UniProtKB/Swiss-Prot annotation:
Spans annotated as Disordered: 365-388
Extracellular face residues: 1-69, 133-143, 209-231, 308-315
Protein name: Mu-type opioid receptor
GO CC terms of this entry: axon; dendrite; endosome; neuron projection; perikaryon; plasma membrane; synapse
Cytoplasmic-side positions: 95-107, 167-186, 257-280, 340-401
Alphabetical keyword list: Cell membrane, Cell projection, Disulfide bond, Endosome, G-protein coupled receptor, Glycoprotein, Lipoprotein, Membrane, Palmitate, Phosphoprotein, Receptor, Transducer, Transmembrane, Transmembrane helix, Ubl conjugation
Motif annotated as NPxxY, chain positions: 335-339
Carbohydrate-modified residues: 9, 12, 34, 41, 49
Lipidation (S-palmitoyl cysteine): 354
Organism in which the protein naturally occurs: Pan troglodytes
Similarity comment: Belongs to the G-protein coupled receptor 1 family.
Membrane-topology descriptor: Multi-pass membrane protein
Function: Receptor for endogenous opioids such as beta-endorphin and endomorphin. Receptor for natural and synthetic opioids including morphine, heroin, DAMGO, fentanyl, etorphine, buprenorphin and methadone. Also activated by enkephalin peptides, such as Met-enkephalin or Met-enkephalin-Arg-Phe, with higher affinity for Met-enkephalin-Arg-Phe.
Ubl conjugation in keyword set: yes
Length: 401
């Protein structure tokens, strides 16, 4: 997310990091680097050469120009995250669009997640240039676009992760209802709703974003109505609650209830295979929750601390700030791995994409026929339906080491 687009929150980390400012090596005490160009009117800790990209801390160095090592480290970090994130997410989207058997409700959510994550990581080159030059050279239009993309995709990515958690909870805990609810059509409608909800912050931020000429440099920043401190802090609080606290609670509760349900199914079936499947899915759940928390917690805590106390501008502070931002974006790189590349069906399609053969083409045609027959499932008792949903869930999650 655009570093200045971050209100002290972290798309980003959807993410938060996405909305944080990358403008300065270290954000001003109350600013959000990528997640919210909240600091349109922050003090200028960097001096005349500082650029406040709104909510993201300015990209300017703590004192004078950044050292060569610091600049190279930050640019390398951003470059790796950008390349890996774009490649992984575009590959996920291509495979889902290319292969008919991948057009399931779950994969439609994954497509939406990959789209949001790809757009989020696409803003990193702008943040890198802003950091190196100490000014925003891209004009007002791109300023508005980059900042709004940060917010839009941070929230869309996180909302989609929550949606997938609820979707899997319904599949396991309410298998009968899942037959009607977990359809590709409903998944598309929910994805559209997630983008509309993200507009609640994305559109206002787009109108608030602007460029300002100050001390020989141009800032891409957010402007707030008076009282400035009130609206700035309100944005930070909203981002923190809706982009971090609530998603963590929703994801944790849904997966926790799912594990409890799977345990009860295992006890009823008495199957050792179900026991192994439960352990496998439990590990997957723990990894998903842990990755989200690890990627987004640092930037949120950092922003809160900077809003409460003044942190001296040092090289370490600059690097750590941008590291937190990159960590939030890293979540966008890991999502394809967690939700797609570990899926056996996805890996099979990827192999077919890399090494197409006539047998693969024939297999794809036969898969279309089998999928059509699965659109009319037979009835069964609740335990059998739950076991069936568990088997489907296993197909969507690859075994973790």
């Amino acid at each position: 997310m655009d570093s200045s687009a971050v209100p002290a929150n972290a798309s980003n980390c959807t993410d938060d990091a996405l909305a944080y400012s990358s403008c300065s090596p270290a954000p001003s005490p109350g600013s959000w680097v990528n997640l919210s160009h909240l600091d349109g009117n922050l003090s200028d800790p960097c001096g005349p050469n500082r650029t406040d990209l709104g909510g993201r801390d300015s990209l300017c160095p703590p004192t004078g120009s950044p050292s060569m090592i610091t600049a190279i480290t930050i640019m390398a970090l951003y470059s790796i995250v950008c390349v890996v994130g774009l490649f992984g997410n575009f590959l996920v989207m291509y495979v889902i669009v290319r292969y008919t058997k991948m057009k399931t409700a779950t994969n439609i959510y994954i497509f939406n997640l990959a789209l949001a994550d790809a757009l989020a990581t696409s803003t990193l080159p702008f943040q890198s240039v802003n950091y190196l030059m100490g000014t925003w050279p891209f004009g007002t239009i791109l300023c508005k676009i980059v900042i709004s993309i940060d917010y839009y995709n941070m929230f869309t990515s996180i909302f989609t992760l929550c949606t997938m958690s609820v979707d899997r909870y319904i599949a396991v805990c309410h298998p009968v209802k899942a037959l009607d609810f977990r359809t590709p059509r409903n998944a598309k409608i929910i994805n559209v709703c997630n983008w509309i909800l993200s507009s609640a912050i994305g559109l206002p931020v787009m109108f608030m974003a602007t460029t300002k000429y100050r001390h020989g440099s141009i800032d891409c920043t957010l402007t707030f109505s008076h009282p400035t401190w009130y609206w700035e802090n309100l944005l930070k609080i909203c981002v923190f609650i809706f982009a971090f606290i609530m998603p963590v609670l929703i994801i944790t509760v849904c997966y926790g209830l799912m594990i409890l349900r799977l345990k009860s199914v295992r006890m009823l079936s008495g199957s050792k295979e179900k026991d192994r499947n439960l352990r496998r899915i439990t590990r997957m759940v723990l990894v998903v929750v842990a990755v989200f928390i690890v990627c987004w917690t640092p930037i949120h805590i950092y922003v809160i601390i900077k809003a409460l106390v003044t942190i001296p501008e040092t090289t370490f502070q600059t690097v750590s700030w941008h590291f937190c931002i990159a960590l939030g974006y890293t979540n966008s790189c890991l999502n394809p791995v967690l939700y797609a590349f570990l899926d056996e069906n996805f890996k099979r399609c990827f192999r077919e994409f890399c090494i197409p053969t006539s047998s693969n083409i024939e297999q794809q045609n036969s898969t279309r026929i089998r999928q059509n027959t699965r659109d009319h499932p037979s009835t069964a008792n609740t335990v059998d339906r739950t076991n069936h949903q568990l088997e489907n869930l296993e197909a969507e999650t690859a075994p973790l080491p």
